[in-house]
């Protein structure tokens, strides 16, 4: 009720120096992100049938985020199972789909590990991010192993306007929480470069929850004499962190991830473009876990993992006034080796060759846009899979669209088991409008029918079918008295089968609220709240709304700018966690400064 009253007051109040129609249009188009590529076939948002949310680098700066994990808390339909010390591993869900059902990509390269399909979103620093595209619902017709959706991190490109530009920043918070970053970017003739590096460390806001992470990302770009370009990228994420600590029970992990690519794109003719890339990924991890192995006896387990991916892809795209056709092939050779570091016993030692063929078309017929897509995958370890999808949009007006989408998808939850493939059929109906004066509004109904879900112990594995259906609603207002409001709500009902027993642990209600204030002196304040009803009878505690306050003040000079920022996280010291072992931190404060040149 309070939220409704606030929204009504803001909509009824007179605007402050803004054009209602123009600002509503910007809200609808996403202001610079009107073309989305999360489906692998870039198309206008008004012709995109999938439920996609885009988060830009400006949005990320506003919340003083450290890693991709911090960004997830602010996306409607996404739930973090735990909020911990910056840089430490977290689990998350998308519309109730577990983390091992969601494919996370760095410029189209998967970062999910092979052992259990875990994507370490806390390892990706936000400084390299230009935008993030969240595809909610099966995305297998584009990416293959993406039952619950895809999160595509699109990195920054060289600054085309200057030879040298950059940024340095540092922040400091409680428990010696420190984040230092720098970046350089520019273009000289045909050659462009983007470089960034940083260090994130903390003594731990919770018991045995320390972090010490280093990162580097580099992109070199060369514009070919004709209509094309060549890119080379390398990303290195390295460091250690404490996962949890509860008495004698504790776990620590030390990991390294290196992703390198060489990519090119070339305009063969006016409507035809070819893109190709070579990709290599190397990762290693060492997990140490301590706990009671017998009454009064504390033991230690160690697991060491080495994984690699080597492959490439080639894609052809045809674009004209009537349609956008995309066809391509992916190939990768994957290998994973896991050993018990104490007993020196192999737990996983497997290789596979994976091939995927995909085809997508967006056909524009008047106000309609039809998007049939399909992909065939030969996984090399868990059989072959065909993943079709079909989407349709109908433009009610220039600023309002109706959407429908249905798709089949799958996820490989482990390279270690041949019977590790879980499958889904996703159906969605939605709308998006900017025609209401001063308001952008989006709504989606969804149903995710997932089967062959592995349950039980290794001795007695069973396969279950889960149905999760619900709704998402998002809204944004234009600034009124320099203050704007954003809201998001997600409802999910989970059952075993169509009408079976209630499914515990599915986030039933998720609420996100944000207030943003920006005055003419370049001062900004953001107040964000989030609430998750985990609907779980376990040891969790989630009755509170967690509020974060972010403040920024920018001072402009002739060629540089200085920004001072501060964050108070968990402002009212609330509890919001799924499991008592993974409690969330209490209130903590962080201060920082950023210089752009």
Language-model features: where?
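Structural signature of Gram-negative outer-membrane beta-barrels, strongest in the C-terminal barrel
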Residues: 225, 234, 322-326, 345-448, ...
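Short acidic/polar hinge/loop motifs at secondary-structure boundaries
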Residues: 109-136
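Membrane-embedded beta-barrel scaffold of Gram-negative outer-membrane proteins
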Residues: 273-289, 336-337, 395, 401-403, ...
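N-terminal Sec signal peptide and the immediately downstream disordered periplasmic leader
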Residues: 2-65, 69-75, 221-223, 595-596
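Gram-negative outer-membrane beta-barrel transporters
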Residues: 363-370, 441, 446-449, 462-535
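Transmembrane beta-barrel wall of Gram-negative outer-membrane proteins
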Residues: 172-201, 206-240, 252-273, 320-325
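Extracytoplasmic beta-strand/coil segments of soluble accessory domains associated
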Residues: 22, 37, 41-44, 69, ...
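Conserved C-terminal beta-signal and adjacent last beta-strands/turns
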Residues: 223, 427, 504-597
């Amino acid at each position: 009720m309070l939220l409704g009253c606030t929204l009504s007051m803001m909509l009824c109040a007179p605007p402050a120096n803004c054009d209602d129609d123009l600002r509503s249009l910007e809200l609808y188009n996403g202001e610079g992100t009107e073309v989305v590529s999360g489906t692998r076939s870039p198309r206008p948002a008004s012709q995109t049938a999938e439920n996609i949310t885009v988060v830009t680098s400006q949005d990320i700066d506003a919340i003083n985020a450290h890693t991709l994990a911090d960004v997830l808390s602010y996306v409607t339909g996404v739930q973090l199972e735990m909020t911990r010390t910056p840089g430490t591993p977290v689990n998350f869900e998308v519309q109730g789909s577990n983390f091992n059902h969601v494919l996370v990509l760095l410029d189209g390269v998967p970062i999910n590990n092979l052992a259990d399909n875990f994507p370490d979103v806390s390892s990706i620093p936000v400084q390299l991010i230009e935008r993030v595209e969240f595809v909610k619902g099966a995305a297998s017709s584009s990416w293959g192993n993406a039952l619950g959706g895809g999160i595509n991190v699109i990195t920054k490109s060289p600054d085309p306007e200057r030879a040298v530009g950059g940024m340095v920043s540092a922040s400091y918070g409680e428990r010696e929480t420190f984040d230092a970053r720098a970046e350089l970017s520019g273009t000289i003739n045909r050659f462009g470069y983007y470089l960034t590096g940083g260090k994130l460390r903390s003594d731990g806001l919770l018991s045995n929850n320390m972090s010490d992470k280093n990162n580097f990302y580099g992109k070199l770009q060369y514009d070919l004499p004709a209509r094309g370009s060549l890119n080379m990228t390398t990303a290195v994420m390295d460091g250690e962190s404490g996962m949890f600590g509860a008495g004698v029970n504790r776990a620590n992990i030390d990991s390294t991830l290196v992703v390198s690519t060489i990519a090119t794109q070339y305009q063969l003719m006016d409507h035809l473009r070819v893109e190709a890339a070579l990709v290599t990924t190397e990762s290693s991890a060492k997990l140490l876990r301590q706990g009671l192995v017998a009454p009064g006896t504390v033991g230690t387990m160690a697991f060491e993992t080495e994984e690699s991916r080597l492959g490439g892809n080639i894609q052809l795209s045809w674009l004209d006034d009537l349609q956008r056709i995309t066809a391509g092939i992916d190939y990768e050779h994957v290998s994973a080796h896991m050993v018990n570091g104490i007993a020196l016993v192999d737990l996983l030692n497997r290789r596979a060759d994976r091939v995927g063929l995909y085809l997508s078309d967006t056909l524009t017929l008047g106000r309609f846009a039809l998007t049939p897509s399909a992909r065939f995958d030969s996984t090399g370890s868990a059989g072959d899979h065909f993943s079709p999808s079909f989407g349709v949009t109908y433009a009610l007006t220039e600023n309002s669209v109706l959407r429908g989408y249905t798709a089949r998808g799958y996820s490989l939850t482990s390279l270690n088991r041949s019977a590790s493939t879980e499958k889904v059929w996703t159906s969605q109906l939605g709308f998006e409008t900017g025609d209401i004066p001063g308001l952008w509004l989006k709504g989606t109904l969804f149903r995710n029918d997932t089967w062959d879900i592995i349950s039980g112990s290794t001795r007695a594995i069973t396969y279950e079918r889960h149905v999760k259906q619900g709704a998402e609603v998002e809204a944004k207002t234009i600034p009124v008295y320099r203050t704007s409001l954003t809201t998001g709500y997600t409802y999910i009902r989970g059952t075993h089968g169509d009408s079976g027993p209630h499914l515990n642990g599915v986030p039933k209600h998720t609420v996100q609220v944000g207030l943003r204030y920006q005055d003419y002196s370049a001062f900004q304040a953001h107040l964000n709240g989030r609430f998750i009803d985990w609907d779980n009878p376990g040891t969790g505690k989630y009755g509170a709304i967690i509020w974060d306050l972010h403040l920024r003040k920018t001072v402009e000079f002739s060629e540089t700018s200085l920004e001072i920022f501060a964050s108070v996280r968990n402002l009212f010291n609330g509890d919001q966690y799924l499991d008592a072992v993974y409690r969330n931190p209490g209130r903590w404060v962080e201060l920082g400064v950023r210089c752009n040149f």
